Every structure is written in C-alpha cells, then in structure tokens.
Curated annotation (Swiss-Prot):
Keywords: Amino-acid biosynthesis, Histidine biosynthesis, Hydrolase, Methionine biosynthesis, Multifunctional enzyme, NADP, One-carbon metabolism, Oxidoreductase, Purine biosynthesis. HAMAP family: THF_DHG_CYH (MF_01576). Homodimer. InterPro entries: Aminoacid_DH-like_N_sf, NAD(P)-bd_dom_sf, THF_DH/CycHdrlase, THF_DH/CycHdrlase_cat_dom, THF_DH/CycHdrlase_CS, THF_DH/CycHdrlase_NAD-bd_dom. Pathway: One-carbon metabolism; tetrahydrofolate interconversion. This is Bifunctional protein FolD. Pfam families: THF_DHG_CYH, THF_DHG_CYH_C. It comes from Nautilia profundicola (strain ATCC BAA-1463 / DSM 18972 / AmH). The keyword Heme does not apply.
Length: 284
C-alpha cells in the first residue's frame, strides 16, 4: 500500500511555481490574488490565512477584502466589479460559504471568468465539461495532479465519485471523463452506495461524513482518494474513509490530513499564476 502524499507533492509544485513567478516578475508582472471574505466564520478565516501564507511563499501578491456579515449583495457586487477592472489583480476568490441573504450563484457569476481561479463560474465549468483549456476547481484539479505524480493511469478505470457538489463532485466527474475513465457518481439519493463503491477501481469521496467508506465497501487493490475533512469531538481531523481498515485493502490511499487538502491550495496558486500568464500574453 502506497500513501499518496499530497503535502510533499504540494511543496514540489510550490517550488516550481516560485520559479514561474520570478520569471513573470522579470517581465514586470507580479501575479495578484484578491480574496473576498464575508463574516466571522472561524474556518473561513483559517482557510484564507493559509491561502495568503501560501501566496507569500511563492511570491504572489495577495489582498483580502473583509466585510461584515451584514454586507448587502449590491455592495459585494460593486467590490467584485472593482476587482474585475483592476489590471494588477489576476485572480479573484470568493471565500464560501456566504451569508444566507446573499445569492451565492449571482456572486460567483459576477466574477470575470478570466480571473475565476476557483473555477466556479458557469463559463469555466462549461469549458471544463467540453475538455477545453480553462480554470478547473482546485480540489478536483489537485486530485488529478496526484494521479499524474504517482503515474496512476485512468484510462478505462471504473471510478466511483461519492458526492455531487458543484465544487468537487461534478467537476471531478468532468476531469475524469476527459481522462477516459468510466465514472459513476453517487450522492445523497443513491440507494445502495456499497454496490457502487465495491466494483470501483478508484473511489473518490468528499461529503463530510466520518467513516462513510468502510473496508467492506471496497475491493482489494482499490485506489482511495479521501477529500472529506471532519473534526471529531476529541479534536482529531479525519476524512470520510475509515483509513485504518480501508488502507489494509487499498493499493494507494490519501491520508487526512496531508492528502488532498494541501493540493487544493497548491492548485489555487497554480491557477493564479496561469491567470497572470494569460494576462501577460494579452498585454504583449
């Protein structure tokens, strides 16, 4: 059994990105990322801090626009418009979740697709489904990088994706299909989850339920990608997979923490550098 070490791979990617950023700076372009953060959610503040630290490490300029939970949709849209028009900012990230009185879809659709480094804009999602060059959401993109690094061939593989969110499940499906995998996507209404996971060569899960995937639900030699992140009452961080027992049957498995999580942030940086490179081509 091989542990798929996302932490180690993310450091390697960041080292390479730093070189790319240094090269862009010689052309007078410093990649810039703006983050919109609304409210006092501790997890959101922690994630934003991690993203800013990662930006600093590779030389990306980052700025956070913080707003109280009471901000109006109109005020938020006005800020997005200002960032869209700023040539020094190449990527714009809306830290989710947003307060209930804000229409999240409307906000995400207001982001300039060329600055949509989270890959959530319908324009970029459409291009992703068509297999065209675009910004893919960071977590599924990170999973694909893990497959590439460990030389896991996806062609013809039966893959079960558990979770059908717009952020992970649906874009994960698109990336896998584009890599010629046969993809089965499961969700809250799936009747017999184990029937789907048992026949899969690869199981990818990201729903936020500890121990959802147990050893009796997978076959020997399975490859397991655990995107879930859950904090237990004792303070431990665990994924959606019963790691201790499933790892005994798996050929490859990601740990939590240290698996997909670090790759998500690395892909945000990669998308931001890509956006800056696209901008550099336009201003030539």
């Amino acid at each position: 059994m091989t542990i798929l070490d996302g932490k180690k791979l993310s450091e390697k990617i960041k080292d390479n990105l730093k070189k790319e950023v240094d090269e862009l700076k010689t052309k007078g372009i410093t990649p810039g990322l703006a983050v919109i953060l609304v409210g006092d959610d501790p997890a959101s503040h922690t994630y934003v801090k991690m993203k800013r630290n990662a930006c600093q490490k590779v030389g990306i300029y980052s700025v956070v626009h913080e707003f109280p939970e009471s901000i109006t949709e109109k005020e938020l849209l006005s800020t997005i418009k200002m960032i869209n028009e700023n040539p020094n900012i190449h990527g714009l990230l809306i830290q989710l979740p947003l307060p209930k009185h804000i229409d999240t879809t409307k906000i995400l659709e207001a982001v300039d697709p060329s600055k949509d480094v989270d890959g959530f804009h319908p324009y970029n999602m459409g291009r992703l489904v068509e297999g065209l060059d675009t910004f893919a959401p960071c977590t599924p993109l990170g999973v694909m990088e893990i497959f590439e690094e460990y030389e896991i061939d996806l062609k013809g593989k039966d893959v079960c994706v558990v979770g059908a969110s717009n952020i992970v499940g649906k874009p994960m499906w698109a990336l896998l299909v584009n890599a010629w995998a046969t993809v089965d996507i499961c969700h809250i209404e799936t009747k017999d989850l184990a029937a789907h996971t048992k026949r899969a060569d690869i199981v990818i899960v990201g729903v936020g339920k500890p121990n959802l995937i147990t050893a009796d639900m997978v076959k020997d030699g399975v490859i397991v990608i655990d995107i879930g992140i859950n904090r237990l009452e004792d303070g431990r961080l665990v994924g959606d997979v019963d790691f201790e027992n499933v790892s005994k049957k798996a050929s490859y498995i990601t740990p939590v923490p240290g698996g997909v999580g670090p790759m998500t942030i690395a892909m945000l940086l990669k998308n931001t550098v890509k956006a800056a490179k696209n901008f550099a081509k336009e201003v030539k």
